[in-house]
Amino acid sequence: MAKKVEAYIKLQVAAGMANPSPPVGPALGQHGVNIMEFCKAFNARTESVEKGLPTPVVISVYSDRSFTFITKTPPAAVLLKKAAGVKSGSGRPNSDKVGTVTDSQIQEIAETKAADMTGADIEAMKRSIAGTARSMGLVVEG
């Protein structure tokens, strides 16, 4: 018989840097999950991801206080800021441009995000990511 899911917890945790401090500790502690066990498993699973990159994770907590988790790809906005070399997007994206991204960089981000995005094809994903870039005040070249 399958275990009963008690809760789903959605967090963004820096890859390879999960520790019991907030936001991880309190979110897991209130459901009675072994926090250090999660931190060790998460850090091991995100070894291949660039250290410190915010990584979304969905944790399923079961009635016996065990858990499983799924890591997702970093948010498109984070990948775009990294590609453009800027710290943050523009406060006024239509008038103040803060950086540029090329079509090849958008292609690379779309391929990275392909597993998580529900776009029909890679071109649709590229258009979606280009729209995100424009809404952040980035100029899309190409």
UniProtKB/Swiss-Prot annotation:
Keywords: Methylation, Ribonucleoprotein, Ribosomal protein, RNA-binding, rRNA-binding. Residues 84-103 are annotated as: Disordered. PROSITE patterns: RIBOSOMAL_L11 (PS00359). PANTHER family: 60S RIBOSOMAL PROTEIN L12, LARGE RIBOSOMAL SUBUNIT PROTEIN UL11M. NCBIfam families: L11_bact. The keyword rRNA-binding applies. Forms part of the ribosomal stalk which helps the ribosome interact with GTP-bound translation factors. One of its GO terms (cellular component) is cytosolic large ribosomal subunit. This is Large ribosomal subunit protein uL11. GO terms for molecular function: large ribosomal subunit rRNA binding; structural constituent of ribosome. It comes from Aliivibrio salmonicida (strain LFI1238) (Vibrio salmonicida (strain LFI1238)).
